[in-house]
Amino acid sequence: MNAPVKPSQLIKGATGDWEVVIGLEIHAQVSSNAKLFSGAATEFGGDPNSHVSLVDAAMPGMLPVINEECVKQAIRSGLGLNAQINLRSVFDRKNYFYPDLPQGYQISQYKSPIVGEGEVVVDLPDGDSTTVGIERLHLEQDAGKLLHDQDPTSTFVDLNRSGVALMEIVSKPDLRSSEQAKAYVSKLRTILRYLGTCDGDMEKGSLRADVNVSVRKPGEPYGTRCEIKNVNSIRFIGQAIEYEARRQIGVLEDGGAIVQETRLFDAGKGETRSMRSKEEAHDYRYFPDPDLLPLEFSQAYVDELKAGLPELPDQKKARFIGSFGLSPDDAGVLVSERESADFYEAVLAALADAARDGKLAANWVINELFGRLNKDGQSIEVSPVSAAQLAAIVDLIGEGTISGKIAKELFEIVWTEGGDPRVLVEARGMKQVTDLSAIEKVVDEIIAGNPDKVAQAIAKPAMLGWFVGQVMKSSGGKANPQAVNDLLKRKLGL
């Protein structure tokens, strides 16, 4: 589904150009208070084995019971990915042995997933966009966690995570660079967070990726792929792809062959290393779970969930552009995180004239607020300047009470001291001078005192800026800049 590969996306090798082919399997933890098949809590960070039911521990005779909220969250996610919702799906047993898997199998979905094909439009850093196909989304259980640092001779098992609901979102092999892959994961994370179906916290493991990488000469069939397991940051996903593509190219150019295998990414060294040979589906001996009936629901059930979906990033971006004249870049920045979009929406709601000042408000949110938050290492949720305060500053600019320069001084005062911007402007004498006679007096003084500059300005109109600067300086930055410009042009005959 993706566009033709650009020359800049090709990797130079000793034998010419190579194309990297990438597919991603995203494991997103479902936002739910209980696990997929038990009532145990999903809270992060509890004492080991403090959130484990008899079902999670695979005690004999205990049967799984589906959590309907997890089903709803999977459907919502599928709808957000423009995907086909399957009204009938089946849970299967994926059989393998590992100490953190008490049953000896994982309950997953193989042939009949809850969500079928979809697509995501991804905006890229260079301004282009690409469409990434979604192959499927299915529900499955997470495994537990092995603890190797509790004892020098023993490994312990923590089953708190065992049975937590995951959505595995499988992309088609449509990605052609590490930058595309990172942008895709960012977009997918944003969509899930808008929907409220996954918190997207990669540090806590709520979102992690298995990265499938292969290389080929342009126009040739797909090469043998390797899977890099459990990469837990967007930056590491990019690094893993870059390293693995180079590694495979090196092997092939040296006359070797790529072995299909599972690899791990060593974040400390920035490289991948072999973990085990890659399993095929038949290795897991999938079969329908006899303890669970097929999952069936009506189209009306899906339609009801669809009607309750929030406005998603692409829709919000289009509205910001159409209603407030924002550039695609600025709108993209605002919708990239749900919290920043919510803050901007709150500013719009507080403005006296959002139609007039919506674009100005966006500039202030992106340049002044985000800039200061980044400088101070703070998140927008704890911003010292509230949406209402920022809206008041924008109102003061829009109505001509203060200039942009004074507004920046006011923003700094509100950031450090707090307070109502309108009260501060009155109390500190920060109002812009709009009295034309007062401004004209200053303009006349500047012109009279600089006859040589007047001659230069008449010959070179760009010199007008010097006069504007002098008038603003004399007025303490309070003169209305537009009035100053108009008066100077009239007085100098420009």
UniProtKB/Swiss-Prot annotation:
Highest taxon listed in the record's lineage: Bacteria
Catalyses which reaction(s): L-glutamyl-tRNA(Gln) + L-glutamine + ATP + H2O = L-glutaminyl-tRNA(Gln) + L-glutamate + ADP + phosphate + H(+); L-aspartyl-tRNA(Asn) + L-glutamine + ATP + H2O = L-asparaginyl-tRNA(Asn) + L-glutamate + ADP + phosphate + 2 H(+)
For this protein, what is any one GO molecular function term?
glutaminyl-tRNA synthase (glutamine-hydrolyzing) activity
Q: Name one GO biological process term.
A: translation
Q: Which cysteines are joined by disulfide bonds?
A: none
Keyword set, alphabetical order: ATP-binding, Ligase, Nucleotide-binding, Protein biosynthesis
Annotated EC = 6.3.5.-
Protein role: Allows the formation of correctly charged Asn-tRNA(Asn) or Gln-tRNA(Gln) through the transamidation of misacylated Asp-tRNA(Asn) or Glu-tRNA(Gln) in organisms which lack either or both of asparaginyl-tRNA or glutaminyl-tRNA synthetases. The reaction takes place in the presence of glutamine and ATP through an activated phospho-Asp-tRNA(Asn) or phospho-Glu-tRNA(Gln).
Known NCBIfam families for this protein? gatB, PRK05477.1-2, PRK05477.1-4, PRK05477.1-5
Q: How does it assemble?
A: Heterotrimer of A, B and C subunits.
Task: Name the family the entry cites.
Answer: Belongs to the GatB/GatE family. GatB subfamily.
For this entry, the protein name equals Aspartyl/glutamyl-tRNA(Asn/Gln) amidotransferase subunit B
From which source organism is this entry?
A: Rhodopseudomonas palustris (strain HaA2)
Output the lineage of the source organism.
Bacteria, Pseudomonadati, Pseudomonadota, Alphaproteobacteria, Hyphomicrobiales
Q: Which gene encodes it?
A: gatB
